[in-house]
């Protein structure tokens, strides 16, 4: 009996040590609390996707508002976006000129949100090379058959955050902009940390920073570059109060409340922790894309070994969470998925398939 008791105590001590180490790594790198979440979502729901037939070149990042589908289309020679009518499948036109003119740009970011001003549909576009923001009047552009830019806002970024560029941008209201600031490589082994920022729209002033991580991680032996350790896909809650971040290399989502500043991480039970980035461990790919409405978060999930640079993985699992981090449903689609966009007008999740 003494021998059995001794083995039992050793096993318990080993488990406690592992748990302490995991909490140490979490607290060392993550700026909030982390809750373990169990998979109580029940059976996987099989979903049959309905085809949307479009007549014309439809490539790139998608965005959808009601009957309008937008593509940030790299195959367009002179414009960045083309728009289709979902009801008819017909192409409405091409918009947002490429070039060096006053209302043109060398590159544009994808659409993150739509809003209306005096019942006219508009969106915010970021031109990084020109350091400008464009307010694109979509309603008038479609009516006139040409790009209508209501407002151009100078928005210098190169000297703002040590050379780190903005990525996702979201208008919280008429005067406040929420922005994701991407990591910036400092050397082959180290990069800056991504964070979120609250800024004024018209005067380009930083009001508050929201840090997700406490410190960078150095690991020359890791199979991925330093700025990819904490890689993620993000989606803002439509009411502008929160953002969800799904991690590319951990089975974890992080929810930041812009009103309270509270940051919570939700990690799948049994999932890897931050120690996976140390040494020569096998780093997997987990979450790929994310979309959200005011009630739920839709995260495209892989959960397997990383794919090669020329491989096209068959990703067809969507995890549905609520805004409290609870996994409420797992969906499995009958086609593989590349990009997603949630239209909150018709309450439809649109997806594109990988281009082979």
Segment roles from a protein language model:
Residues 129-175, 179-184:
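Asp-box/WD-like beta-propeller blade repeats and closely related beta-sheet repeat scaffolds
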Residues 83-85, 139-140, 191-203, 313-326:
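Beta-propeller blade signature
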Residues 47-81, 298-301:
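Beta-strand-rich domains and repeat architectures in extracellular enzymes and scaffolds
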Residues 96, 101-105, 270-279, 323-344:
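Conserved blade-ending motifs and adjacent loop-strand segments that build the rim/top face
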Residues 280-319:
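Loop/turn-rich, solvent-exposed surfaces of beta-rich toroidal or solenoidal domains
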Residues 58-65, 110-120, 165-174, 226-240, ...:
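Structural signature of eukaryotic scaffold interfaces centered on beta-propeller domains
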Residues 30-57, 324-326:
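A short helix->beta-strand "capping" segment at the edge of beta-propeller domains
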